[in-house]
Swiss-Prot record:
It comes from the Bacteria. Transmembrane segments: none annotated. ATP binds at S55, V56, G57, G58, N59, G60, K61, T62. Its EC number is 2.7.1.130. Pathway: Glycolipid biosynthesis; lipid IV(A) biosynthesis; lipid IV(A) from (3R)-3-hydroxytetradecanoyl-[acyl-carrier-protein] and UDP-N-acetyl-alpha-D-glucosamine: step 6/6. InterPro entries: LpxK, P-loop_NTPase. It is an enzyme of class 2 (transferase). The gene is lpxK. Transfers the gamma-phosphate of ATP to the 4'-position of a tetraacyldisaccharide 1-phosphate intermediate (termed DS-1-P) to form tetraacyldisaccharide 1,4'-bis-phosphate (lipid IVA). It catalyses: a lipid A disaccharide + ATP = a lipid IVA + ADP + H(+). This is Tetraacyldisaccharide 4'-kinase. One of its GO terms (cellular component) is plasma membrane.
Length: 331
């Protein structure tokens, strides 16, 4: 319902205008308080890069985080990642992921990032607590926060915003009247805007997701021969139609395409009842939640972000100046 309200044409949204105004006042006052120093932001001893967005829903932040980690590792940096760990309930906070960590403990995105990149990943409701743990470890020289653009309790040195290039900003209204956490003017203060799909606006960096060979959910084994053209598909992400469009573009005929809410907790019986023994394709983010109970007929599609080298060059140009003592909130 809200998605239709935000991204379609509906006069109903004006009924939510008073709530959007209240949200604007409260969030704006909070942001102003941090910028003026009335509220103190934690300043890390190493550079902090935020990868976030100004709208709710999945815009492709996690592939960007993985891309950034891999690019930094290739250039000799030792990155670590912090996240809120949404959807998980860890035994304690801050919680550092290890090989045995589950999505029930840490959330799906942190588990995926840790598996794909191999870098240290720490989750905590207060990201500053996660940052402190990474600092104390001595293992990292730069920290990337997955989401958290609006988490002003953590000072940052670089801000990257990912935009859905197809849906853009919907009706451009603030929550709950529209999908925006912050007004579009907030983008004037960020270091780079990444456009995921669609046509990038002037000054934005174009990003596309490149699909790899499907892998079996149960054991990550790569498919040795093409999957049947006719498959079922599920996606428990912020915008499932994007995944289904990717599969259709790869030539798959989707008998069933079922979208679930972001961070949906899947159950084996639920999925078997819905899809039976038929070949089933899902996102890698969903696969990390289904691995322990997956059937042999369940597969996921790995995707990687492809971004211009000029984006990394821009970031690296900023990093040398961050080795000197820094002050302020970076907001």
């Amino acid at each position: 319902m809200l998605q239709q309200l935000w991204y379609g044409k509906s006069g109903w949204r004006w009924l939510l205008a008073p709530f959007a105004l209240l949200f604007a006042i409260l969030s704006g006052a909070r942001r102003f308080a941090y910028r003026r120093g009335w509220c103190k932001a934690y300043r890390a001893t190493v550079p902090v890069v935020v990868v976030g967005n100004i709208s709710v829903g999945g815009n492709g932040k996690t592939p960007v985080v993985i891309w950034l980690v891999e690019q930094l590792q290739a250039r000799g940096f030792r990155p670590g990642v912090v996240s809120r760990g949404y959807g998980g309930k860890a035994p304690h906070y801050p919680y550092r992921l290890d090989a045995a960590s589950t999505t029930a403990q840490a959330g799906d995105e942190p588990v995926l990032i840790a598996r794909r990149s191999g870098c240290p990943v720490v989750v905590a409701p207060k990201r500053a607590d996660a940052v402190r743990l990474l600092e104390q470890s001595g293992e990292v020289d730069i920290i990337i926060t997955d989401d958290g653009l609006q988490h002003y309790g953590l000072a940052r040195d670089i801000e990257l915003v990912v935009v859905d290039g197809v849906r853009r900003f919907g009706n451009a209204c603030l929550l709950p009247m529209g999908p925006l956490r912050e007004p579009v003017t907030r983008l004037k203060r960020v270091d780079a805007i990444i456009c995921n799909g669609g046509e990038p606006a002037k000054g934005e960096y174009a990003m596309r997701l490149v699909a790899d060979v499907p892998r079996r959910v149960r054991d990550d084994a790569q498919a040795t021969e093409p999957l049947p053209r006719a498959v079922d598909a599920l996606a428990g992400i912020g915008h499932p139609p994007r995944f289904f469009a990717t599969l259709a573009g790869l030539g798959y005929e989707l008998h069933q395409q079922v979208g679930y809410g972001d961070h949906h907790a899947f159950d084996r019986d639920e999925l078997v009842a819905r899809f039976g023994q038929r070949p089933l394709l899902m996102t890698e983010k969903d696969a990390v939640k289904c691995r322990t109970f997956a059937l042999d007929s369940w597969w996921y599609l790995p995707v990687s972000a492809e971004l211009p080298a000029s984006l990394l060059d821009t970031l690296l140009q900023k990093l040398p100046s961050l080795t000197v003592p820094r002050s302020g909130s970076g907001l």
